[in-house]
From Swiss-Prot:
Membrane topology summary: Multi-pass membrane protein
Alphabetical keyword list: Membrane, Transmembrane, Transmembrane helix
UniProt keyword Transmembrane, yes or no: yes
GO CC annotations on file: membrane
Record's keyword annotation contains Membrane: yes
Family that this chain belongs to: Belongs to the TMEM45 family.
InterPro entries: DUF716, TMEM45
Location(s) in or outside the cell: Membrane
Name of protein: Transmembrane protein 45A
Transmembrane stretches, start-end: 7-27, 51-71, 100-120, 150-170, 218-238
Length: 275
């Protein structure tokens, strides 16, 4: 992650998966309330989506792991350089380990929805584990760095740790849509904050560099972090409104088609009686 693209990659991953989790939670909730939405509310569809989600998470994790190891100048799976007598790019191994635990989450997703004997709640436990590992890694990621660098990573640790707590609560309290949406909003915040860290530490396109020892920059980024979270709340709200409208409009079309079929059946019955 020693450049802007290295922060944009996990930022994109987390933002996409956060938006998907938000959409899935809202869709499940609306479909339970509107039971006539037919196939949209079927367990078979959601099980297939969970398996597809697991495959996607595994693919994202493998992409991140390969990127950390095999980029030019990367560690190339060598943890210790015996010739030089020191550890080899441990920060890259930090990121590799983070991706690895999210890969385990994807594997758990696939197994829990293909093997009926496994508890579905295992996925929430694996998500909580992955997030706690990520928080632990980034907490110990910035020793000896500049003040602003440490601060933006501390904010990242805060949101990751809170997301892990929410995921663990979901493990204990199942099918709570508010907890699911809170977790989704925090994952979205994590994704957008990765981008913000990239802009601060590695300004793209030759932009002006941030003074990493300026206290006013810390004051601004404190406000900026709150703005990021406000945007994620707006995204969740807009997503909820859109999915509600989409499901209800589909329900209206189904109802109108059912009414039309009933009218046609009545007309056919009346014509048969007349004959």
């Amino acid at each position: 992650m020693g450049n802007f693209r290295g922060h944009a990659l996990p930022g994109t991953f987390f933002f996409i998966i956060g938006l998907w989790w938000c959409t899935k939670s809202i869709l499940k909730y609306i479909c339970k309330k509107q039971k006539r939405t037919c196939y949209l509310g079927s367990k078979t569809l959601f099980y297939r989506l969970e398996i597809l989600e697991g495959i996607t998470i595994v693919g994202m994790a493998l992409t991140g792991m390969a990127g950390e190891q095999f980029i030019p100048g990367g560690p190339h799976l060598m943890l210790y350089d015996y010739k030089q007598g020191h550890w080899n790019q441990l920060l890259g191994w930090h990121h590799f380990t983070m991706y690895f635990f999210f890969g385990l989450l994807g594997v758990a997703d696939i197994l829990c929805f293909t093997i009926s004997s496994l508890p579905v709640s295992l996925t929430k436990l694996m998500l909580s584990n992955a997030l706690f590992v990520e928080a632990f890694i980034f907490y110990n990621h910035t020793h000896g760095r500049e003040m602003l660098d440490i601060f933006v990573h501390q904010l990242l640790v805060l949101v990751v740790f809170l997301t892990g707590l929410v995921a663990f609560l979901e493990f204990l309290v199942r099918n709570n849509v508010l907890l699911e949406l809170l977790r989704s909003s925090l994952i979205l915040l994590q994704g957008s904050w990765f981008f913000q860290i990239g802009f601060v530490l590695y300004p793209p396109s030759g932009g002006p560099a941030w003074d990493l020892m300026d206290h006013e920059n810390i004051l601004f980024l404190t406000i900026c972090f709150c703005w990021h979270y406000a945007v994620t709340i707006v995204i969740v709200g807009m997503n909820y409104a859109f999915i509600t409208w989409l499901v209800k409009s589909r329900l209206k079309r189904l109802c109108s088609s059912e009414v039309g079929l009933l009218k046609n059946a009545e007309r056919e019955q009346e014509s048969e009686e007349e004959m």
